[in-house]
Every structure is written in C-alpha cells, then in structure tokens.
Amino acid sequence: MKRICILKGSPRKDGNTNTLLKPFINRFESEGYICDTFDLHDMDIRPCMACRTCQQDQTVFGCCYDDDMDKIFDSIMSSDLIVLASPIYSWYCTPPMKMVLDRLVYGMNKYYGEGEEKPALWAGKKVAVLTTCGYRPEKGADLFEEGIKRYCKHSQLKFCGMLAERHLGYDTVFFDDEKAQRAVEFAEKLSCRLQHKELEI
C-alpha cells in the first residue's frame, strides 16, 4: 500500500494552503494511497538545539526531546512521498514547518557524529512542495523551492516538484476550478513518479 506523509504548516484550518490540499489529497486517496496528515501548529514540536544527541545512535531518529516529532519520523519512514504544504511567510515556510525541517535534517542525517558510517536514514525518499503566496510564484515561492532543493540534495532525497498558487489579496477569492485542477494534475504527476514512470514535473 502506497503511503504519503503530508506536513501541513498553515495555522489556518480553512486557509488557502489547506484548501488547495483538499483536491490534491482526494486524488491520491482515489488511487488507494494512505495519506498521513499532520497539522504542525497543533502538535508539540520543539526547536532543534543542535545538541547532537541524535547523532549517538545511527539507526534511529534519537532526539533528546520527547515530543510529537517521533510520530512524523515514523510516518516518513513508512511513506513513499513527503509533501511539505505551507504558505509563504517572509519568503519561506511557516515557523512550525521550519522547526520540523531543522529537527529532521539532524535526526535523519547522521553526518554530524563521531561514527565512521554517516548514513541518511531517509535516503531516496521523494519530496514535493505545495505552497501559496501573495507574490507571483517565481518571486514569492522561489526561495523556498531553492532551499528545499538544496535540503534534498544534502539529505539524499529526491525533489519531485512544487505547486505554488498565488492569492491576490484578502478581498479576493483565492480558490477556483483552475487551481483545483492544477492540484489534481500535480497529484497525478507525482503518482506517476511514485510508480517509476518517466514524466516531467
């Protein structure tokens, strides 16, 4: 059974990013995928302190904190795709998403300890980004996309693409049929990628 881990960084349950996610998730579920979704704002997730406790055991996540990150770790390790879904705040993701990324880059990548072997526990996992922003995506979401591309390269992950949709302002309607269709098409392309079909995203 194919499984997807979806990390939701929006503080608003009915905000633009979560609205865009609905047809995206529905498309995957219609194909039989299991979608694990995590509302990061509702979870107990603490910031990385760079203590390197996680580097002492190269086989487990191993963080010193006893919080909800273990749930995310377990989901990621059993998933075929990781989806980072966040609105853009100051040209990057929201603070809870950034905390998760910081915790994962240490806990998953055993590059920083004393052991001779330095594995990436999640090497080969596929990553996609779904985001919303106020500027045109090429000016509003480009830094986040580039950051995640570098993050993936560092972590031996496979970046599979980004869907970014613009909102023109709080006095305008964000969601429409065209955005819904693009979300569905993005899900379809990612599904093809997961099935090892050659397809540009």
Question: Positions of the model-derived regions?
Answer:
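N-terminal beta1-alpha1-beta2 submodule of the flavodoxin-like/Rossmannoid cofactor-binding fold
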Residues: M1-S86, S90-N109, E114, Y170-I201
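Hydrophobic anchor at the start of a short beta-strand
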Residues: C35, F159-C160
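Short, glycine-/small-residue-rich phosphate/pyrophosphate-handling segment
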Residues: G113-S155
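Beta-strand-loop-alpha "switch" segments that mediate conformational coupling across diverse proteins
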Residues: G161-R166
